[in-house]
Amino acid sequence: MKNNIVIITGITASGKSELCDNLIEKYGNISIINCDSKQVYEEIPIITAQPPKQEVFYKLYGYVSAKENYSVGLWLEDLEKEVNHALENAQIPIITGGSGLYISSLIKGLSSMPQISQKVRKNVSELRKNLSKEEFYKLALSKDPRIQGKVFMNDSHRLSRALEVITETGKSIFVWQENRQPPLFNNFKIYTILPKREDVYRKINSRFITMIENGAIDEVKKLLSMNLAPHLPAMKAHGVPEIIKYLKGEITLDEAIQIAQTNTRHYAKRQYTWFKKQFLNAEVIDCANKLKIF
């Protein structure tokens, strides 16, 4: 196999996990390595749809404490070890997940991003909380005009990040992103799964209901009991902020479910746009069942 590292990416709820299960069952000599920024956290396996811990084929899932502000740089270090271990043991590494920053850093190299002070992070977080979406977007755009057409109003996470960087350094986040380290590997084949939107949206809705039934609320209760800072990544996993509002009595459970489903669908919509513009050498398929790797 010329490209002995496989990357399977795509939008949320596109069937990546089911595909990996099938590949393990069919071939066996593979190592599934996580490329999802929230599935690394140990305390939230249900709401991030992690595979069972006893599955020895799966690597880099549920092994980081939610107390940690885990970064793409740390993930690349862990990834390199797992890929090399797989290759040394005659296994094919299959890197899978939908976190765009992780995948982009793997393929194109890691950007030399600046450290953001707690003061700036807190100030931006307060602005994000107190301003409307439109006001927050206009503020970010006034500080960094380069975000126009690249970061959109509903993408509050990327807007916050852009505002943090320009506030901390005086330089656009895109200036920092242009300064990249060499990529870890270049011998890979990438597949992007982009199913029909209505199928994805339907699965997002049903999957969140299943997560609630399987104990997601208790999972978030335990997360709350840890008294974590709200800016930590685990606290921003899809469904966590909405369930926290429910547990605090701010909204009903039905409202929490509906809002979480809506927010995740919006995230999937943004992923569609992003993945279509990225990785032009990827093989794009509309259904995980159509993917043929070997």
Curated annotation (Swiss-Prot):
Annotated region (Interaction with substrate tRNA), positions in chain: 36-39
GO molecular function ontology, one term from the record: tRNA dimethylallyltransferase activity
Residues noted as binding substrate in the record, renumbered to the chain: T12, A13, S14, G15, K16, S17
Function: Catalyzes the transfer of a dimethylallyl group onto the adenine at position 37 in tRNAs that read codons beginning with uridine, leading to the formation of N6-(dimethylallyl)adenosine (i(6)A).
Gene3D superfamilies attached to this UniProt entry: 1.10.20.140, P-loop containing nucleotide triphosphate hydrolases (3.40.50.300)
Subunit (UniProt): Monomer.
InterPro entries linked to this entry: Dimethylallyltransferase, IPT, P-loop_NTPase
Family under the similarity heading: Belongs to the IPP transferase family.
Reaction(s) this enzyme catalyzes, per UniProt: adenosine(37) in tRNA + dimethylallyl diphosphate = N(6)-dimethylallyladenosine(37) in tRNA + diphosphate
UniProt-annotated binding residues for ATP: G10, I11, T12, A13, S14, G15, K16, S17
Keyword Manganese set for record: no
Name of this protein: tRNA dimethylallyltransferase
The enzyme's E.C. designation: 2.5.1.75
Record's keyword terms, sorted: ATP-binding, Magnesium, Nucleotide-binding, Transferase, tRNA processing
Record site: Interaction with substrate tRNA: S99, R128
Cofactor(s) needed for function: Mg(2+)
